Amino acid sequence: MLTLQAETRKEKGTGFSRRLRIHNKFPAVLYGVKKTEILLILDHNTTFNLQKKIEFYKENLLLCVQDKKYKVKVQAIQRHSFKSKLLHIDFLYVE
């Protein structure tokens, strides 16, 4: 099982996302049925290297957010149209 480190965030919006991307990070969200959504910040290079593996899309991932661990699955990925950059990832809780 692949492991991914994340931080929580409180801000939303285009301006905040742009500031994150300048610092080589990008926004993500973790959500599920009857669960509260968690807004996340991921490191771009680490995530980009992990997403090159087929297991990133087919298997469950272990998402470590501060001191909690969640079993998640990738729901959606937004990529830049011509640069090799990730813009946003949606994660789904796995029971």
Curated annotation (Swiss-Prot):
InterPro entries: Rbsml_bL25/Gln-tRNA_synth_N (IPR020056), Ribosomal_bL25/Gln-tRNA_synth (IPR011035), Ribosomal_bL25_short (IPR020055), Ribosomal_L25_dom (IPR029751), Ribosomal_uL5_bac-type (IPR020930). The keyword Ribonucleoprotein applies. One of its GO terms (biological process) is translation. Transmembrane segments: none annotated. It holds the Pfam family Ribosomal_L25p. The keyword Hydrolase does not apply. Keywords: Ribonucleoprotein, Ribosomal protein, RNA-binding, rRNA-binding. One of its GO terms (cellular component) is cytosolic large ribosomal subunit. Belongs to the bacterial ribosomal protein bL25 family. HAMAP family: Ribosomal_bL25. Part of the 50S ribosomal subunit; part of the 5S rRNA/L5/L18/L25 subcomplex. Contacts the 5S rRNA. Binds to the 5S rRNA independently of L5 and L18. This is one of the proteins that binds to the 5S RNA in the ribosome where it forms part of the central protuberance. This is Large ribosomal subunit protein bL25. It comes from Buchnera aphidicola subsp. Acyrthosiphon pisum (strain APS) (Acyrthosiphon pisum symbiotic bacterium). The lineage of its organism: Bacteria, Pseudomonadati, Pseudomonadota, Gammaproteobacteria, Enterobacterales. The gene is rplY.
